[in-house]
Regions:
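Radical SAM/AdoMet-radical enzyme domain recognition
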Residues: 53-73, 83-173, 189-192
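Short loop/turn segments at strand-loop or loop-helix junctions that form parts
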Residues: 20, 32-34, 75, 125-130, ...
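Flexible mid-to-C-terminal extensions adjoining Fe-S/redox cofactors in radical SAM and related proteins
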Residues: 1-4, 12, 245-281
Length: 281
């Protein structure tokens, strides 16, 4: 059985995450927020103006002092585009000299299209299936977005697009077709084939880790690794770069801010939150 082994040899801080806390519009079974639901689900800052987020200015000043330019708005147990003051936050962050990117499931893209096109950082889309039944098993939603229309619509001169596909028990037989489909979009910079991560649910999620590694071994036989990116293999498939991303085994590094005021210098999200959430009170 495969295991999740954390690589604690990290690079210097490359970026920082703003981890929103609140209720999501999807229900992904592997969501990292489900590792510690008793701690995270009591918070909801989706409708709280960022000027009222505890320790937010401290976090931004820390990023400035460290020379960190790239920030990502993401959801720890929610989605970035659910934030009520999303467009205002973009202007505030980027007017301070940062480049803001987002991580999103895409379901609210049309509501925030103008804001997304203003982003100077990356737009990270999560696309785990193109099949309604499979998507419902993974994300708790059967509706598949019109990516043929939306992907070109969100691309602008200032942002770039990365698509993350989390390989799991439900979509394992669809991965090659998904990658082939996504590879036709010139607007997509690269595809990230992500492995599930967990700190507290190995008993239920190690099955997915093993599925990932089995698929990777098959892919590696047919497609050559041409480079690595922070310890992750880069393989060209159907003309598009696919980065095989085992999050905790890479050497990437980041600071993490949570909208309840917790600040963590630990790249490992759950571990960092558990070690720091009381200190930020």
């Amino acid at each position: 059985m495969e295991k999740i082994n954390k690589n604690r040899n990290r690079e210097e801080y490359m970026f920082a995450n703003i981890n929103l806390l609140g209720k999501c519009n999807a229900n992904c079974y592997f969501c990292l927020g489900k590792d510690i639901p008793n701690l995270l689900n009591i918070h909801n800052q989706l409708h709280v103006h960022f000027s009222e987020w505890k320790n937010f200015e401290k976090f931004l000043k820390d990023c400035e002092s460290r020379g960190i330019k790239r920030l990502y708005l993401t959801g720890q147990n929610t989605d970035a585009l659910l934030y009520e003051y999303f467009d205002e936050l973009i202007d505030y962050i980027q007017d301070r000299g940062f480049e803001l990117g987002i991580r999103t499931n895409g379901y609210l893209i049309e509501k925030h299209l103008s804001g997304i096109r203003k982003l100077k950082g990356g737009v990270g889309l999560s696309i785990h299936s193109l099949d309604s039944e499979t998507n419902n098993k993974i994300m708790g939603r059967p509706d598949i977005l019109d990516w043929e229309r939306l992907i070109p619509a969100i691309k602008s001169d200032t942002n770039h697009i990365r698509v993350a596909v989390v390989i799991n028990r439900y979509n394992k037989d669809q991965i090659i077709d998904i990658i082939k489909y996504l590879s036709k979009f010139d607007e997509i910079d690269y595809i990230q084939a992500r492995r599930i991560s967990t700190d507290t649910r190995e008993d239920t999620l190690l099955e997915d880790v093993e599925i990932y590694e089995n698929l990777y071994r098959e892919v590696e036989k047919k497609f050559s690794v041409y480079d690595t990116f922070y310890n992750a293999q880069r393989i060209r498939m159907f003309g598009k770069e696919v980065c095989w991303w085992r999050t905790v085994e890479t050497t990437a590094n980041s600071i993490n801010y949570f909208t309840d005021g917790t600040i963590s210098g630990n790249y490992f999200i759950v571990e960092g939150y558990l070690n720091n959430y009381k200190r930020s009170e």
